[in-house]
């Protein structure tokens, strides 16, 4: 197992903060301040509620949950959301702004602070999570011990949830499979190569630069070789600056795409000619992270959502979407993982890198100063 329409998820998936504020509702009412809500807002584990049934009761009393930046075709989130609704029909989920970046998730929380429209929970790239721990409430789910230490903040401020490998998807009716990164610099790929977002804000795009770095004989201590590759791609006229969505892939508008393997693989449902390749050599892996808004308007529902996401049921639903759930190793040992789906995942590269917190932070700073000029 590894040591998160397509949204432009912000930076790092274990691999900056920026983005416009999002006014989700201009006339929203302030969130209610009941004693029970206050108790839920300070709960750091299931023990603070008593039992799961007690947490369920508290969440159902709130009756609502605000999620943000969860496209239904991203890692099978549609089925995850529907499963939660089926299990808890008295909790109405509001799916806010599914295509925004993680940086914009944080801006939405700040813009809507104190309102019942504020997001209750986040799904974030590591760099944005690291930069915004003051926005999060610590919480350790019941399955906390199953989660590798390297993939969780020690107090539960943010926790890895699902991950994958950076890949290249392409329309095989128009292009040959790239066998090496530099193949994409050739004339055959003129105006065709897109990344999923802006790497200063979006995790998948950040990872594309990371992959390009290690494929260019660099290391994750310095993303400059990856930035240089995309500068060459731009100068060759091959870089396509179009936001990648399911629709752009299906229509052929974005025919070659750097993205997570589970997202690229999902496009085969809409385009039978769509193929996915993980380049030989060093691979790049990453996870997204869950966090709870410390000012969540529905704090009990936020914590119940976390408990659900780290249950066997939801972890297997992410697996169904082609992502690698963070509890996969523990579930495999316990016999609770869907072995058919688990064994069907693409083979991992022989050598895989995952950026540390320090490397992610340094890369984010470098991209912030160098990226825009490099791809002009």
Predicted regions: what they are:
Residues 1-25:
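Sec-dependent bacterial lipoprotein signal peptides
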Residues 24-37:
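Bacterial lipoprotein signal-peptidase II cleavage site
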Residues 49-60, 70-92:
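Short, polar/charged alpha-helical segment
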Residues 66-82, 94-110, 116-253:
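Extracytoplasmic ligand-binding site segments that recognize negatively charged/polar headgroups
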Residues 127-133, 250, 255-274:
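A ligand-binding cleft/hinge motif common to bilobed small-molecule-binding domains
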Residues 163-167, 227-232, 238, 271-294, ...:
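Periplasmic-binding protein-like
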Residues 284, 288, 292-352:
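Mature extracytoplasmic/periplasmic domains
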Residues 335-376:
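Extracellular/periplasmic bilobal clamshell ligand-binding domains
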């Amino acid at each position: 197992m590894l040591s998160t329409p397509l949204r432009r998820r912000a930076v790092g998936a274990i691999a900056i903060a920026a983005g416009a504020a999002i006014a989700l509702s201009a006339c929203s009412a302030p969130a209610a301040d009941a004693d029970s809500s206050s108790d839920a807002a300070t709960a750091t584990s299931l023990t603070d509620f008593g039992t799961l049934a007690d947490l369920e009761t508290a969440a159902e009393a709130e009756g609502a949950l605000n999620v943000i930046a969860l496209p239904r075709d991203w890692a099978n989130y549609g089925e995850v959301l529907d499963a939660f609704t089926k299990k808890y029909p008295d909790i109405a989920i509001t799916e806010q702004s599914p295509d925004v970046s993680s940086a914009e998730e944080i801006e939405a929380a700040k813009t809507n602070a104190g309102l019942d429209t504020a997001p209750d929970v986040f799904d974030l790239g590591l760099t944005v999570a690291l930069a915004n721990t003051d926005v999060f409430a610590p919480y350790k789910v019941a399955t906390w011990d199953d989660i590798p230490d390297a993939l969780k903040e020690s107090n539960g401020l943010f926790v890895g949830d699902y991950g994958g490998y950076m890949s290249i998807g392409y329309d095989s009716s128009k292009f040959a499979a790239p066998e090496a990164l530099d193949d994409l610099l050739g004339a055959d790929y003129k105006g065709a190569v897109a990344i999923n977002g802006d790497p200063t804000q979006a995790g998948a795009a950040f990872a594309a630069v990371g992959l390009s770095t290690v494929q260019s004989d660099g290391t994750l201590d310095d993303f400059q070789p990856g930035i240089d590759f995309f500068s060459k791609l731009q100068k060759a006229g091959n870089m396509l600056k179009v936001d990648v969505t399911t629709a752009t892939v299906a229509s052929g508008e974005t025919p070659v795409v750097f993205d997570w393997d589970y997202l690229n693989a999902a496009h085969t449902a809409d385009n039978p000619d769509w193929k996915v390749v993980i380049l030989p050599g060093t691979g790049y892996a990453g996870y997204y992270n869950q966090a709870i808004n410390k000012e969540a308007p529905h704090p009990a529902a936020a914590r119940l959502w976390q408990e659900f996401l780290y249950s066997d049921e939801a972890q297997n639903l992410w697996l169904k979407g082609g992502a690698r759930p963070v509890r996969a190793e523990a579930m495999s040992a316990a016999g609770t993982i869907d072995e058919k789906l688990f064994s069907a995942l693409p083979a991992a590269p022989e050598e895989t890198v995952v950026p540390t917190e320090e490397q992610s932070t340094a890369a984010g700073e470098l991209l912030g100063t160098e990226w825009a000029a490099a791809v002009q």
